[in-house]
Every structure is written in C-alpha cells, then in structure tokens.
Amino acid sequence: LGGYGMDAYWAYVCSKDIPLRYSDFNIGKELRQNEEAIAERKDWIGTDKGRLNLLMADQCDGIVTGLYEYWRCYEPFFPEKTTFIPFPIVIGKEPNIPQETPEKLNLFIGISKNRSAYKGTDIMLRAAEKVKKDFPDKLNLKVVTGLPFDEYVRTMMGSDAIMDQLYSYTPSMNPLEAMNHGVI
C-alpha cells in the first residue's frame, strides 16, 4: 500500500491523535477549520472509502510512505510493515549556480487556486508581499497560479528560492524539483 497523501490514516491521525505540531488538519492541538480540512475529514473519517483504506492497510504485506509525516500516521498502527522511502528525484546535469550573490533575490511562489489556505501559501504570499513592499530593491517576487507541473518547473527556472507548502515537514515534489535545478 502506498501512503503518499490524503487518506484515512492521514485524516484520522492528524485530527484525533495529533502527533505533529502542524499538518493539513491541525495547528498545535487545535483542529484547522478551513474548508479543505473539514471536507477531507468528512470524506475519509468513518466513510466507506475510509473503511476500505483501513482494510487495505490491515491486509496488505507492506506500506510505503513518501513523506515523514505520512509515516508518522501509519507506523504506530503497523510498525513491522511501514517503511519510509523519500520521493526520488531524477538527477540530470549539474545545475549552473552563480557564485556571486544577486543584487535582488528572485523568489517564486506557485499558488493552487482552491488550496491556498490548505497549503499555507496564502500566509507565505502575504509575508513575501510585505518583504517586497518594505524592500523593493532587494526582492523580485514571481507569483503564478494554477500551472501544470511542467509549466510550473519552466517558470520556476531562474529563481533563487521558492516558497511551497507551509504545513509540510519534508520536501514534496515541487521543492525536490527546485533543488534538482539549484533553487532553494
């Protein structure tokens, strides 16, 4: 079984046991009440789909999780068969990273239109916009919305750093792709 994202264990454990300081479902001991978190809890906890996920996890031979936070949700229930294997990146040619410090930081943030609050990009965008306002001569800010992954990667090129998910502990695909190209 693959534990790679939204499922019954992720929704239940982060809403009930709360082993992480923050997640898609909690900040501290408080449950997040944004639209996406509420909808995902309703979709996975105590539903046929959620029960199927529980059954599959119980009956499978092994569970592979792709992020540390997903491992935290499966491992307490299935310590003998839960394994964390980080998401891979395909290493291409070595990125060209300039040795000199740029005059302006080129900062990139990609926004998923309907998932901004859920991912925390709304908070990061406000912070970046404040820095841009306070230090316009120090920051170039590129904001994109709703791009397919290939276009996202092309648009990100030339950036020094990206802002991605506020509530994630481990790099997901966008930051891994960025690091592969020498972008922080």
Please name every model-derived segment.
Residues 107, 125-151:
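A conserved nucleotide-sugar
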Residues 1-35, 82:
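Active-site proximal beta-strand in glycosyltransferases
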Residues 7-12, 71-75, 92-94, 116-117, ...:
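Short catalytic/ligand-binding loop motif for oxyanion handling, primarily in non-cytosolic enzymes
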Residues 54-65, 69-89:
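Helix-loop-beta element that forms the nucleotide-linked donor phosphate-binding surface
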Residues 157-170, 181-184:
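Acidic donor-binding loop of glycosyltransferase active sites
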Residues 83-119, 125:
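Conserved donor-binding/catalytic core segment of Leloir-type glycosyltransferases
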Residues 153, 175-180:
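Short alpha-helical segment that forms part of, or immediately flanks, the ligand-binding pocket
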Residues 22-62:
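Membrane-proximal helix-turn-helix segments that form the acceptor-binding/catalytic region
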